[in-house]
């Protein structure tokens, strides 16, 4: 059963936070949604981390007229993986994004204008630093679990290394300890698409630079898929409306990318896209440490990792590198390689493949009372 109508909430922290860059971002607003009820000792809270272009709207609908539920609706609700009769589930929008939390589209209180490119560069660690303040303000000392895929997995890595005493377990899916040169290259091309749109105006646009942002999204979307899934979905079919010898005729896959690119423009801010892409590229779990091993030496919670066989953006070997390091340190870690043809997006599309394993893992954490 899905959750019922949910409402977005927010908190504002007037003192803000000190960022990894050394700058102070203040005030900050954090948008979030919750599902279920926090128990009396606040031991049943699970924080779910969203990916690059996600939001706090994890599940359910925000009004009766909503046509689409939240981005991971299938796993949240009574009797589902994240059972809201048992757990208090939280999802917040990261700072730097554009769905209610402070980002480049927010108003700078010092100028009364949008931050745009005066917004400071942020890191994944900065995002989690803000989340930690939210969790404390909700009266939660220790999270039963933190769970996330892709960029959400990077945030989860920061929780297990920066705040090991604040979590009792963690689930990480389709993530990486650091993006590869290939991943950075794809993001670079996406950035250039926006930079070269004349309507971007170095971030000072009135309306989203639609052509640049649509192309950037299409480039990113390709990295979320796989050759196998694209062959199955599209093959080499031409659009029924386009002739093979029409110069502007399109393959079905082209029409798909065109639709996904331009539909994205209406819901996401171009500058936020750029700032979050920068945060992704900068990410390295060992930043500030001598090595990954030194970072992972801080881990105290049991961990569960998932990789997906056809994910070429953050391929299984990158997860296996982390798992190997953690096991050498004697940490409690599970690893599951899921056979899938869906590429990087498998963590969103094939929850049935990992849900029983995650349920067992969370059941064990819950049985310990979040200790």
From Swiss-Prot:
Its EC number is 2.3.1.31. Pfam families: Abhydrolase_1. Keywords: Acyltransferase, Amino-acid biosynthesis, Cytoplasm, Methionine biosynthesis, Transferase. GO terms for molecular function: homoserine O-acetyltransferase activity. InterPro entries: AB_hydrolase_1 (IPR000073), AB_hydrolase_fold (IPR029058), HAT_MetX-like (IPR008220). Pathway: Amino-acid biosynthesis; L-methionine biosynthesis via de novo pathway; O-acetyl-L-homoserine from L-homoserine: step 1/1. SUPFAM superfamilies: alpha/beta-Hydrolases. It is found in: Cytoplasm. Substrate binds at residues 217, 345. Homodimer. This is Homoserine O-acetyltransferase. It comes from Pelobacter propionicus (strain DSM 2379 / NBRC 103807 / OttBd1).
């Amino acid at each position: 059963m899905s959750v019922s109508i949910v409402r977005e909430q927010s908190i504002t922290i007037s003192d803000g936070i000190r960022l990894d860059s050394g700058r102070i971002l203040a005030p900050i607003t954090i948008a979030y949604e919750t599902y279920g009820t926090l128990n009396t000792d606040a031991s049943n809270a699970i924080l779910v981390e969203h990916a690059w272009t996600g939001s706090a709207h994890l599940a359910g609908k925000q009004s009766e007229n909503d046509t689409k539920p939240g981005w991971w609706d299938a796993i949240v609700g009574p009797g589902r993986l994240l059972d809201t009769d048992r757990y208090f589930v939280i999802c917040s929008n990261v700072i730097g994004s554009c769905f209610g939390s402070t980002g480049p589209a927010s108003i700078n209180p010092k100028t009364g204008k949008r931050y745009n490119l005066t917004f400071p560069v942020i890191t994944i660690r900065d995002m989690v630093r803000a989340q930690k303040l939210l969790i404390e303000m909700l009266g939660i000392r220790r999270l039963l679990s933190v769970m996330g895929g892709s960029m959400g997995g990077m945030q989860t890595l920061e929780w297990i290394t920066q705040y090991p005493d604040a979590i009792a377990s963690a689930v990480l899916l389709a993530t990486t300890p650091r993006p590869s040169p290939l991943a950075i290259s794809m993001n670079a091309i996406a950035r250039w698409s926006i930079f070269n749109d004349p309507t971007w105006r170095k971030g000072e646009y009135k309306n989203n630079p639609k052509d640049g942002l649509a192309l950037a999204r299409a480039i990113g979307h390709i990295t979320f898929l796989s050759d196998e899934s694209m062959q199955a979905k599209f093959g080499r079919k031409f659009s029924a409306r386009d002739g093979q010898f029409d110069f502007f005729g399109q393959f079905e896959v082209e029409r798909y990318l065109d639709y996904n690119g331009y539909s994205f423009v209406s819901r996401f801010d171009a500058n936020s896209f750029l700032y979050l892409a920068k945060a992704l590229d900068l990410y390295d779990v060992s930043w500030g440490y001598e090595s990954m091993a030194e970072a992972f030496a801080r881990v105290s919670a049991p961990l569960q990792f998932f990789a997906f066989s056809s994910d070429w953006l953050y391929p299984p070997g990158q997860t296996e590198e982390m798992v190997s390091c953690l096991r050498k340190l004697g940490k409690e870690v599970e690893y599951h390689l899921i056979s899938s043809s869906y590429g990087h997006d498998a963590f969103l599309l094939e929850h049935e493949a990992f849900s029983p394993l995650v349920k067992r893992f969370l059941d064990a954490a819950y049985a310990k009372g979040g200790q």
